[in-house]
C-alpha cells in the first residue's frame, strides 16, 4: 500500500461483471479529473492461446483436469506483484494487452490469442487501476492484496455468474453451451481455491442476487435483468460508512447486517457512485500530500 501512489483493485471471475464496474470507475475518474493507469488481468496470463491449449493438453494427459486461467500457475502473479510494488514505490510500472479477437487485432496489429509488447505506464498518473481475476491474491508466494489500497470484489451468486458466462461466451466467442459447461467444470477447483478466498481480502464486495428462478443456469434463455435483481454490498470495515445517508439516497435500499446494505439492481450504478467517489477522492487527496 502506498499513500503517494495508490492502487485500486477490482477482482471477479469471468462473467462476474467486472467490466461493468470498470465502466463506473471510468465515469468517476473522468468526472473527478483523476488520471488512472490501468491493468487488465489477462495481460498477466502466462501463456498465449496456442501455448495455453498445449499446456491444457499436456496436463490433461498427465491426469490434471483442473488447470485453467483461474489457476495460480497459469498467471504471472509474481510479475503482477512486482508491478504493484513498483507502482506503489515510484508511480512507474508496465503492462501489456492480451488480444482476444479480430477487432482488437485490427487496433493493435497483433494476431488474436497473443500479447502485445510490454509498455510503460504514463509517468503522471494519480493511481493504478487493476481489473481481473487475481487482484487480491494471498498465498505462500505472493501477497498482492497487501499492495492494494482499495480492493473491490464483484461476486454474483454462482448460478447467475454461470448464466452470464454462458450467454457471453455463446454470443461473443461462438461457444456452445456444452463447451462453456466443460470450461466451468474444469475451472471449479481453481475457482474454489484461487478465486473465492480473495473475497475475504476485499474492502467492499458487490454481490448481485437474482429474484427470479435461476435454478438451472444451463437452460436459462435470458440473463436476469437489473430489475430482476438486488445487490448486496458488504463492507469489510463499516466504520465511517454513512448508512443512513446511503439508504436515504438509494430508494428501496435497506441494511441487512451491520456491515451490509441491499440495493435494487437498477440502482447499482448510483450506489457505486455514492460509495466509491468519496473513497477515490480521499486516496487521491492523500497521495497529493504524501
Swiss-Prot record:
Keywords: ATP-binding, Calvin cycle, Kinase, Nucleotide-binding, Photosynthesis, Transferase. Pathway: Carbohydrate biosynthesis; Calvin cycle. Gene3D superfamilies: P-loop containing nucleotide triphosphate hydrolases. Pfam families: PRK. InterPro entries: P-loop_NTPase, PRK, PRK/URK. Is not found in cells cultured chemoheterotrophically and only low levels of activities are found in those grown photoheterotrophically on oxidized organic acids. This is Phosphoribulokinase 1.
